[in-house]
Amino acid sequence: MPQVDPDLFDRGQFQAELALKASPIAAFKKAIRRARDVLDERFRSGRDIRRLIEDRAWFVDNILQKAWDQFEWSEDADIALLAVGGYGRGELHPYSDIDLLILLDSDDHEVFREPIERFLTLLWDIGLEVGQSVRSVNECAQEGRADLTVITNLMESRTIAGPEHLRQRMLEVTSTEHMWPSKEFFLAKHAEQKKRHHKYNDTEYNLEPNVKGSPGGLRDIQTILWVARRQYGTLNLHALAGEGFLLGSENALLASSQEFLWKVRYALHMLAGRSEDRLLFDYQVRIAGLLGYEDNDAKLAIERFMQKYYRVVMSIAELSDLIIQHFEEVILSDDSGTPQPINSRFQLHDGYIEATHQNVFKRTPFAMIEIFVLMAQHPEIKGVRADTIRLLREHRHLINDEFRNDIRNTSLFIELFKCEIGIHRNLRRMNRYGILGLYLPEFGHIVGQMQHDLFHIYTVDAHTLNLIKHLRKLQYTEVSEKFPLASKIMGRLPKPELIYLAGLYHDIGKGRGGDHSELGAIDAQAFGARHHLPAWDTRLIVWLVSNHLVMSTTAQRKDLSDPQVIHDFAQFVGDEVHLDYLYVLTVADINATNPTLWNSWRASLLRQLYTETKRALRRGLENPVDREEQIRRTQTAALDILVRNGTDPDDVEQLWSALGDDYFLRHTAGDVAWHSDAILQQPADGGPLVLIKETTQREFEGGTQIFIYAPDQHDFFAVTVAAMDQLNLNIHDARIITSSSKFTLDTYIVLDHEGGSIGNNPERIQDIREGLTEALRNPDDYPTIIKRRVPRQLKHFAFAPQVTIHNDAQRPVTVLELLAPDRPGLLARIGKIFLEFDLSLQNAKIATLGERVEDVFFITDANNHPLSDPQLCRQLQDAIVKQLSVNSEPGNDLRISI
């Protein structure tokens, strides 16, 4: 800490100002304001961050000393003012906790009660927010023994004012001789760390990470130092290195990583104007700018900054694991077991694998891959001994092109993917120890690569490894209940290692600019050649990487009731083997991207596409389903149900004659019978008919189906979706049919706001039915736009809506595809625009992915014809862009093909 820094705090000038004032408060406040401005300016100008936080602690020391001196303490008074915790370490960020301990010799506080209260009141009055405790030396011992947080705080203390001997006595009575011996302290701190990591999902890669508490954050470094201090009395990283427990390179890496996180935390506090350790979207862009990051052709500044952040915390996590493992071996292990040989290079020591000698990786570099294969083949191995982790780190520079092309290494790497268990766990270890990104440089490029959206909640490397984890879990019995079809298919894949390899490469092209699927396919082709895979295996992996998005896109954006859609997709996959691999990869990809994306409705769409495509492949691509044949089959089956229930066939025929072919193509026989029976029983003046039921497995299991039958009116869709929005229903599919008798037959598949179906909830169903009926009876009185605040996170992902308009080659409709930021009431806004342009909605596919929507609308003009006027299309596009823009102006986002 500085001894003198008059620009930050001039003691003489401050003393003079105190003498001139009747009250000291104004002088203190002025000094605090000035110091904050000086320190913030030093940060902006690039001041060394370590000096900066020490300067702030030095300034607060001076302020506290001056405040303490405002009161009369006798020279022999047994009372001292101590800094504890982070402040005790001499580290203060703009709004860090200023933790104080007022330490007394006697358990009797009464003699000092009044001056202590006046001292704390002064601190409050001058705007210094402190956390304080008042304890005697004996009370410190009692509370330290009982509370892990208290003993940790007391270990980091400095005397600010008063006699030093009190602090020394406190340290003596709270030493390991009296409480918290190093073994007990280590176990408690390790458990505390695990609990804290679990709070943050056990990943360094949260979208809005906590700089202090998340895995790889500042708290992990502090945990190392706390354990070291309890065991060795070591004060800092440099001293730990001096004791031989950290290599010089490890010390340098931890120190530089700590300084980077300090910069981020300092900027967070400065921008937030309060204590804030969450790297929220609100601040990420501005911090990237403060730290000097700029956009380039491939990545935004925020993506470059966050990639640096994630790589830093990953390095901290790696070293933290190593050091904690080292502490565990030193503090907990009795080291009495005899190592059990595995082969000439490795042995098992207390359940952990270790190298048999220091030169294993130097003499046999292939052992850097072999060690992970051995752990997969021997699942009883708990992990890697600390010294061996260190050896791996020291020798990974040997991974060069010669290493990558060595057939021993390529064979071992493929062998890992053929192991029955441990694939994901050991790929994670390879990534944690920096081996995977060196062996596969293309993977190294995506380590820590974020995507600035709410759809992808993990970095690319974390998502990739999660995908492999999901693939592996499909073979677990408990998971097969949630994913029965995917689990069944996974169990019969002829070469499961190929799906793992496709998963490893599916997103590897991200962050380079261009189509990541195409770039990844090129990398996958090169991987297959380098690893001497059979030609068919390589072709399948490349095909899967190149087309890994096609199945989800088809399921979510195409009309799966259209036989032509199924036929086209069947032609695309070509055979059942490709269909099986693609389906399993798609299921794992969605679940590994964002757990909230996977819901029963999305599952049902993929299952339907898989089942219908498999049926088409078995029937033969040369024998596609005829539309007329499908209509006849649906009508025959539906009529059979109705007649068995006592319905007059003539009434049915009269009703059906007005419905048109599309109705029977888009609905199952069961739904047709359900609708028809209710419509025929509906009184002529009964108002809108609203039917609600859970969908069955064959009919898109997992969503709630709402069927509405009513006289057609121009604002029908706009009013309906606005009412559903108010009822907290998320629409995932809409099928709009208008009969020749001018009645609308609309079917909506909805989920609740948490992504589940409505279920068997009579009260909720009745509320929905009454809400929709009331809205449709009184459309003029109903607000078509629900005004709600845009959620905080969505505000940071605004982009110009993109609208694509083209006519369908197979059907007489115009297809309007929309990519836009999500916002409350979006569909109601779209419905309002369709109303203004006199357009009829025939069908809609709705998908919300994180902060954006990807919707497809099938529309016609007032005469039920496709749109043919390019000028009208441009006006429609402009209206949508204007209505849906959050913070962006309409741009040239139109693609029209009329």
From Swiss-Prot:
Its EC number is 2.7.7.59, 3.1.4.-. InterPro entries: ACT-like_dom_sf (IPR045865), ACT_dom (IPR002912), HD/PDEase_dom (IPR003607), HD_domain (IPR006674), NT_sf (IPR043519), PII_UdlTrfase/GS_AdlTrfase (IPR013546), Polymerase_NTP_transf_dom (IPR002934), UTase/UR (IPR010043). One of its GO terms (molecular function) is [protein-PII] uridylyltransferase activity. Keywords: Hydrolase, Magnesium, Multifunctional enzyme, Nucleotidyltransferase, Repeat, Transferase. It comes from the Bacteria. Its cofactor is Mg(2+). Gene3D superfamilies: Beta Polymerase, domain 2, cca-adding enzyme, domain 2. CDD domains: ACT_ACR-UUR-like_2, ACT_UUR-like_1, HDc, NT_GlnE_GlnD_like. Residues 460-582 form the HD domain. It catalyses: [protein-PII]-L-tyrosine + UTP = [protein-PII]-uridylyl-L-tyrosine + diphosphate; [protein-PII]-uridylyl-L-tyrosine + H2O = [protein-PII]-L-tyrosine + UMP + H(+). Uridylyltransferase (UTase) activity is inhibited by glutamine, while glutamine activates uridylyl-removing (UR) activity. Residues 1-341 are annotated as: Uridylyltransferase. Residues 342-704 are annotated as: Uridylyl-removing. One of its GO terms (biological process) is regulation of nitrogen utilization. Residues 705-788, 815-891 form the ACT domain. Pfam families: ACT (PF01842), GlnD_UR_UTase (PF08335), HD (PF01966), NTP_transf_2 (PF01909). Has four distinct domains: an N-terminal nucleotidyltransferase (NT) domain responsible for UTase activity, a central HD domain that encodes UR activity, and two C-terminal ACT domains that seem to have a role in glutamine sensing. Belongs to the GlnD family. Modifies, by uridylylation and deuridylylation, the PII regulatory proteins (GlnB and homologs), in response to the nitrogen status of the cell that GlnD senses through the glutamine level. Under low glutamine levels, catalyzes the conversion of the PII proteins and UTP to PII-UMP and PPi, while under higher glutamine levels, GlnD hydrolyzes PII-UMP to PII and UMP (deuridylylation). Thus, controls uridylylation state and activity of the PII proteins, and plays an important role in the regulation of nitrogen assimilation and metabolism. This is Bifunctional uridylyltransferase/uridylyl-removing enzyme. It comes from Pseudomonas syringae pv. syringae (strain B728a). The lineage of its organism: Bacteria, Pseudomonadati, Pseudomonadota, Gammaproteobacteria, Pseudomonadales.
